[in-house]
Every structure is written in structure tokens, then in C-alpha cells.
Amino acid sequence: MANLSSDFQTFTMDDPIRQLAELSNTLHHFQTFPPPFSSSLDSLFFHNQFPDHFPGKSLENNFHQGIFFPSNIQNNEESSSQFDTKKRKSLMEAVSTSENSVSDQTLSTSSAQVSINGNISTKNNSSRRGKRSKNREEEKEREVVHVRARRGQATDSHSIAERVRRGKINERLKCLQDIVPGCYKTMGMATMLDEIINYVQSLQNQVEFLSMKLTAASSYYDFNSETDAVESMQKAKAREAVEMGQGRDGSSVFHSSSWTL
């Protein structure tokens, strides 16, 4: 019994050391394997089945319970990533809803401002147009432009007045053509006016010459009339003197008159 107990103790002491060595070898081998390595670890650990009465079995169970395998880590990471994605989605939805609400508010305010600005701009434009139309009407009333109207196009009042004025000018020019010698219808306006000016100047010269002659004739007539008046006055005085002498000496005058007979 003593030998069995000593052998059992040595077996029990040697088994954990062997198990630790095997675990170190398997871990070293696990580090050399490429991922995925969950199935290889499971195969390594579960193919080596130990009896239940070994004390290392509890250690193996503890090791399986305490160590997190990569499959568990992957599951945890996937769950955490899913949770993060859900959180992100919820945050993005909240941000998008807030942005949409803010954008709607800004659009409503901007549309209201645009409508107000549009009304103000339309009012300003209408007032400006009214002012411009009034200014244009005033300018049209002030400006009087005489435009030469063609035949059949006398529609404006100014063009009608211009047409009437030109008709009167043409009538007067026809009268001058009949009066002034050397003026013909085939002549131009400039040559016709030159002929009329020359004719008027010649008439002025003739009038001046005739006026000089009239002044000379009138002066001569005045001198002759003065001499005739002096002579008539002298004759009248001589007759009066003769008559006075006869009244004083009537007999002598009678004798002289008788002798003369």
C-alpha cells in the first residue's frame, strides 16, 4: 500500500508538469498557425481526452473556462460592431431629421424673405417704371423736333405741321418764280435763292437812283417857284405906286391922257 501510494503521488506530481509542457507546446504551435484558428484549437484540445480521475482534468476545464477563444472574441466583436452600427444609424437618423427640420425652417424663412423681397422689388420696379414713363412723357412734351415728313407718312402732329409749313414755302417760291426773271422750276433751291437775292439788290439800286433824281428835280422846282413869287410881288408893288401917283395929279394925268389920244 505504501508503494502504491508513493507511485500514485509521483504520478500525480508528474502529470501536471507534463500537462503544462504539453500546453506550452500546443500554445507555441497555436501561435505558428495562421488564422482562422478556432477550429484547430478546438481540435487540439478536444482530441486529447484525459480521464476524469486525472487531476489535470480540472485544470483543463478551468483552462477552457478561463481562456477566451478567438471565436468568442469574434462573436463579441461582431456584436459590439453591430451595436456600434445601430448606434451610428440612430445618431445619423437623428442628425438627418434635425438637419431636415433645420433645412425646412431655413427654406421656409428664405422663401418668406424671398417673397417679401420679391414684393418689395416689384413695388420698387413699378415705381421706377412709373417715374421713367413720367420723365419720358415730360421730355417728349419739351422736345419739339421738326422732322421732314414723306408723302403718306404724316401721322404725328409735328410732321403734319411741318408738311403744312413746307407747302406754304413751296407756294411762295412759285410766286417768286413768276415774278423774278430767270427763275425756273428745274433750278435748285440754292440757285433760285441766289437769283432772287440778285434781283432784289438790283431793285434796291434802281430805287436809290430814282430817289436821287426826284430830290434834284424837287429842288429845282422849288427855286423857280421862289423867283416867280419875287417877280409877282415886285410887279404888284409897281402897280400900286403908279396908281398912287395918278391920284395926286389927276389933271396932268387927264391932259396927258387926252394928248395921247
From Swiss-Prot:
Stated induction or repression of this protein's expression: Induced by brassinosteroid, auxin and ethylene, and repressed by abscisic acid. Insensitive to gibberellic acid.
Gene: BEE3
GO CC terms, sorted: nucleus
Disulphides: none
Disordered: region residues: 72-158, 242-261
Primary localisation category: nucleus
Domain of life: Eukaryota
Stretches with biased composition (Polar residues): 95-123
Function in brief: Positive regulator of brassinosteroid signaling.
Gene Ontology terms, MF aspect: DNA binding; DNA-binding transcription factor activity; protein dimerization activity
Tissue-specificity statement: Expressed in stems.
Biased segments, Low complexity type: 72-82
Effect of gene knockout: No visible phenotype. Redundant with BEE1 and BEE2.
GO terms, biological process: DNA-templated transcription; regulation of DNA-templated transcription
Occurrences of domain bHLH (ranges): 153-203
Subcellular location: Nucleus
Lineage: Eukaryota, Viridiplantae, Streptophyta, Embryophyta, Tracheophyta
Compositional bias (Basic and acidic residues): 135-146
Protein name: Transcription factor BEE 3
Pfam families: HLH
Subunit (UniProt): Homodimer.
Keywords carried by this UniProt record: DNA-binding, Nucleus, Transcription, Transcription regulation
